Design a protein with these regions (language model features):
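Short loop/turn segments that connect beta-strands within beta-propeller blades
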Residues: 1, 38-42, 49, 89-92, ...
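Extracytoplasmic beta-rich repeat domains
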Residues: 1-19, 47-69, 79-82, 96-118, ...
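Extracytoplasmic
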Residues: 13, 29-31
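Residue-level signal for tight coil/turn positions that link beta-strands
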Residues: 22-23, 31, 41, 71, ...
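Ligand-binding pocket scaffold of soluble enzyme catalytic domains
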Residues: 27, 34-36, 58, 97-98
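WD40 beta-propeller blade core
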Residues: 35, 86, 130-131, 173
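A sequence/structural signal of beta-propeller blade repeats
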Residues: 75, 84-88, 95
Length: 187
């Protein structure tokens, strides 16, 4: 048993794993409430409402892709036709960059791999897989992927020079990462 000094409630409950970094906890609720808490007290440091900020609606199962901390940024899947992903300043919650568009959010968490000596933020959306520079959001490569709406859930898995993207209803994708320049080839 552990003492509980505070509790937090969300409409529709959270579906994302909280992200803990230093003395902060970052949560993303099912309806798009992105909140930064002080870990020891539960006091809110900043918050954003992704549904309003990105003029979108929750996917069928709500926001369910946990945020990723990279340096001084918190990277999230945010919406659809306005932006697919965005990075926020860890301390203030201010948007640092936004990138991509998608027919639906999907549920795949952002992940970082290194290929061709370059750090690449890999993002999966219902009709494609793409990578951007995690510091700027600038597109590095993109390949089509018909994942049957937003039903993709698992994070891409890297093995050697290959990147495996698992979908739904047998729609999987194997990519070979170029070792000279950021890019991929469908295998």
């Amino acid at each position: 048993d552990y003492p509980v000094t505070y509790t937090i409630s969300y409409p529709s409950g959270p579906r994302c794993t909280p992200t803990v970094h230093g003395d902060r906890v970052y949560t993303l609720g099912a309806e798009g409430s992105l909140i930064c808490f002080e870990a020891s007290t539960g006091s809110i440091q900043w918050s954003r409402e992704l549904k309003e900020d990105y003029s979108t609606k929750a996917a069928t199962w709500g926001w369910a892709s946990h945020p990723l901390v990279d340096g001084d940024r918190l990277i999230c899947i945010v919406g659809t036709d306005v932006a697919h992903a965005a990075a926020f300043d860890l301390d203030s919650g201010a948007e640092v960059w936004r990138t991509g568009t998608a027919s639906e959010q999907g549920y795949v968490p952002p992940s970082i791999v290194t290929g061709a000596g370059v750090r690449q933020l890999v993002l999966v959306k219902p009709r494609g897989v793409y990578a951007v520079n995690p510091e700027t959001g600038q597109l590095l490569w993109e390949t089509p992927y018909d994942a049957d709406n937003g039903s993709i859930i698992m994070a891409p898995v890297r093995l050697g020079n290959y990147l495996y993207v698992g979908g739904f209803k047998s729609k999987n994708l194997l990519l070979k990462m170029d070792q000279k320049t950021p890019g991929v080839e469908v295998v």
